[in-house]
Amino acid sequence: LVRKRCERLYEGRMGVWNGSLKAELRPAEIVLAKKTRSFTAAPLDTLLGAKVCVDDFNNWFYSKNMECPWTVGMTKFYKGWDEFLRKFPDGWVYCDADGSQFDSSLTPYLLNAVLSIRLWAMEDWDIGEQMLKNLYGEITYTPILTPDGTIVKKFKGNNSGQPSTVVDNTLMVLITMYYALRKAGYDTKTQEDMCVFYINGDDLCIAIHPDHEHVLDSFSSSFAELGLKYDFAQRHRNKQNLWFMSHRGILIDDIYIPKLEPERIVAILEWDKSKLPEHRLEAITAAMIESWGHGDLTHQIRRFYQWVLEQAPFNELAKQGRAPYVSEVGLRRLYTSERGSMDELEAYIDKYFERERGDSPELLVYHESRSTDDYQLVCSNNTHVFHQSKNEAVDAGLNEKLKEKENQKEKEKEKQKEKEKDGASDGNDVSTSTKTGERDRDVNVGTSGTFTVPRIKSFTDKMVLPRIKGKTVLNLNHLLQYNPQQIDISNTRATHSQFEKWYEGVRNDYGLNDNEMQVMLNGLMVWCIENGTSPDISGVWVMMDGETQVDYPIKPLIEHATPSFRQIMAHFSNAAEAYIAKRNATERYMPRYGIKRNLTDISLARYAFDFYEVNSKTPDRAREAHMQMKAAALRNTSRKMFGMDGSVSNKEENTERHTVEDVNRDMHSLLGMRN
């Protein structure tokens, strides 16, 4: 595949690029100014061929971030931003240059300069050289399909969807920056003493010696000569006011922490694009991570997250342990590379177990904040949410020793509960036991103590259990935990291995792959809802492709079905029920099975198919209706074990012997009597 794409690029056959609007939130004033940004996606042919040409150079380029005057490939976490800002000398003038309409303003001259750099760095390979030239020709003069169906051809600017956009943009700004410095009269040696700059795409950040600040005034015109629109008016004396890639570094514990504008972080919470509840929780966690350093904002996001976890369906995810969370210690580690202390981690686990109540633990959600309160307890129904202060905030599960300690505490609690149950046989006994891990306190003789409520065991020694030689043949501990799904052990549906053999057999007979089988089985399920799963069906079944009927032979379905086709289709019961409910959400729909039985209640339509699996959750009314329909379908039905014998011959051998004295051919002699 890649070879074919490279061949196409080598021959100069251009693909059509797809132009679309970027899905993003932008300030109202920018929208009113009609500065909506577009995105041009490369066709697959160009994309794969281009990656062969540019990937090696790009990987080298990423590896040189911070060593050379660019930050492409750096991470803002683990003190990456601190390293970046400390590259700028203290006391200099700092400028965050603002480039506008960058991609569309790039001239073919700059793109050709990037091509020259790549050709210089490239190995000696004539085919690759031609591919690279054709690629940058296509990037400069690109055929673009717009959303209204028009194809336009641009003659300048870079494409946002090509595989080397950021590296190419960085190189073009780098070339322009060197051009501006040389034009201002600074050679390489002088430049190192008076100017430090870093680039990432169209973002440019400059630190310049105060004695040479006037040079910045000439940069705008120098950049314009190469077609770039840059404003160098934003100048600062404090590094914390310097904006780069929409971030500015704020000092926390003498470390520069990168921070987005609070409005951008709140926008992550406001704009909900998620299709699954898990994705919504991940977006909130992302906002929490970005907000660290804005103490008030982090606290408010944690409060919002607490509220979200009390709402459906997020509360169920939290109970299942599927709600992501990052502790204060985790965030501090992410930005500063500082590990949490053992005391912090132990405090977190101790607080977790201290709040557990009863035999079934309630939902516990821990939130850390930077507030001065030690603990803020918020209760809602059976949910406890704890806000821990910065000093008390810890992260759990980071150390094996802590896990062992956690398991040990659980075992001690179980032993304590068993002791309490054993000591509850006498109703007058008073429990004076203390919490696990606490010192025994002196008992005040003036108090009555606490009574232990007796528990009834599910299985007791009084039960009559099957035994051999006095020993029980059942493992009661296993039986207490053995709660299989009814459908997995029911003999009304095929086993997993039987279903797998049926699937493989049908797939091979039909000559389909797994993706095609998925579509085909959709049609089969709907056909069986309408026509049933009788073992006597034959001929063909059909599914619709638009307005066209597509026939499939029924024979493979029945041949490979063991024990029966209905038991195979029982695996589709739940999906069929959901399909009928989906149809009824938009139209009145009753399967033919229900129509034939004259089922008048449309609310029972979802149960009106013959391979429906009745289970413990089936409503009584639906179960009765299904049984009545089944009884009506099978009324007066009988099956003969034997049919007519296929052998129709009834020949038999005549062993009768006659003589001339016999009366006739049917009668022997009557003792000498004659007519």
From Swiss-Prot:
| Disulfide bridge positions per record | none
Q: Which Pfam families match?
A: Poty_coat, RdRP_1
Where does the record place the region Disordered?
397-447
**Any idea which GO molecular function terms this record carries?**
nucleotide binding; RNA binding; RNA-directed RNA polymerase activity
GO-annotated cellular components: viral capsid
Processing and modification events after translation: Genome polyprotein of potyviruses undergoes post-translational proteolytic processing by the main proteinase NIa-pro resulting in the production of at least ten individual proteins. The P1 proteinase and the HC-pro cleave only their respective C-termini autocatalytically. 6K1 is essential for proper proteolytic separation of P3 from CI.
Q: What is its EC number?
A: 2.7.7.48
Composition skew (Basic and acidic residues), residue ranges: 397-424
Report the InterPro entries cross-referenced here. DNA/RNA_pol_sf, Poty_coat, Rev_trsase/Diguanyl_cyclase, RNA-dir_pol_C, RNA-dir_pol_PSvirus
Give all residue intervals belonging to the RdRp catalytic domain. 92-216
Enzyme class name: transferase
Q: Where is this site: Cleavage?
A: Q388, S389
The biological processes this protein is annotated with in GO are: DNA-templated transcription; viral RNA genome replication
Keywords for this protein: Capsid protein, Nucleotide-binding, Nucleotidyltransferase, RNA-directed RNA polymerase, Transferase, Viral RNA replication, Virion
Reactions catalysed, as given in the entry: RNA(n) + a ribonucleoside 5'-triphosphate = RNA(n+1) + diphosphate
Spell out the family assignment given in the record's similarity comment. Answer: Belongs to the potyviridae genome polyprotein family.
Q: What is this protein called?
A: Genome polyprotein
**Organism from which the protein derives:** Papaya ringspot virus (strain P / mutant HA 5-1)
